[in-house]
Each structure stands twice: as C-alpha cells, then as structure tokens.
Amino acid sequence: QISHAFLDTKFSAFKRGAQPRLGDFISLTEYATDIPSHIAFPLQSLKNGLGEYLAQQNLSQLRIAETEKYAHVTFFFNGGEELAFANETRVLIPSKKVATYDLTPQMSALEITQHLLVDIKEKKYDVIICNFANPDMLGHTGELQATLQAISCIDQCMGEITASLKQHGGEAIITADH
C-alpha cells in the first residue's frame, strides 16, 4: 500500500525521493494494522446485508467467481464473514495459471458463463451473485489490447447471460465493484 511509502521509516520497496513532512495522515479505512494512521471510516460489523437478508427470506443464492474475485462474492459480500448463509451455494472456478493475465484475457469468464447458463435454464437459484474478474484484472496490467479483448469477452458473456435470463423469466442487475 502507498501508505507504507509515506509512513514507514524503513520502507525500501522503491526509491521515495524527497519525503514531505506530514502534519497528519488519515486513511479511508484500516488496510493493515501496522500502518500508524488515523482511520476515517473504521471497520464496522455488517448486519442484515443482502446475503443475510436473502437467507432470512429462505431464498436460494449462488455465489460464483473465479479465484481472483471469489472473496468478493463470498467473504466481502457477506460483510467480512467467511461462513456461508443458509441456502447459499458457492462455486469457485479456478483462474488460469499464467504469469500475467494479458496472456489469457478471457481468464475463466467462459467457464463461469457456461455454469451460469445451465443454472439459469434449470431455474436453480432465486438470486445469482457473480463477479467477472477480467475487466479489473486486465485493466491493472496496463495492456490496452488485452484489456479490450477482456471487455469484448465479457460483452459476449453478458449477452448470452441476459438472453438466457430473458428467455427463462429472470432479471438482472449489472454493476461494477469499482
């Protein structure tokens, strides 16, 4: 984290150059316990989040992602809790084993999509929570062409998924995690 570069006197990951004298340092949230800073928004326990609410309503829910984003649809979506709620099914699709994702821009999106198409057709779940990793992970590579390939892949996948939802009476909310 960049916070270490500002606050850790023994920081050596890269050359910092001139160091400004800081009057104070405030982090938006607590990223790590070893960062000596004030916290603007301390961690809070999330109660009755969407996953918990769905469980209370006895609705079945699928959480699906590949390795790189699995925690986003499970741990983080459940308010920092590792345990699954009642009627919550988790599917982890392994991420491709490559040195950098620009070598495989589609990552595991096609496998996730195929899994979703089967579940949508079978009307297996009341709610599906899915995270496609490629737009974020490829964007971080800085490789524009590979990122465009990732976006094209997701566009194709989302087209198939939304067509299947429409055909089988489902609905979708499509958003980004950041």
Feature map (PLM): residue ranges:
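A residue-level signal for conserved active-site and pocket-lining positions in enzyme catalytic cores
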Residues: 75, 130, 177
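His/Asp/Glu-rich, glycine-adjacent segments
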Residues: 1-124, 140
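Metal-dependent active-site segment of extracytoplasmic phospho-/sulfohydrolases and closely related
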Residues: 149-178
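Loop/turn elements at helix/coil->beta-strand transitions in domains of secreted/extracellular proteins
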Residues: 123-126, 168-170
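Active-site His/acidic residue clusters
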Residues: 124-157
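Glycine-rich, histidine-containing beta strand-loop boundary motifs that form or position
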Residues: 65, 132, 174-176
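Active-site-proximal loop/turn and secondary-structure-junction residues that shape catalytic pockets
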Residues: 81, 134-136, 176-178
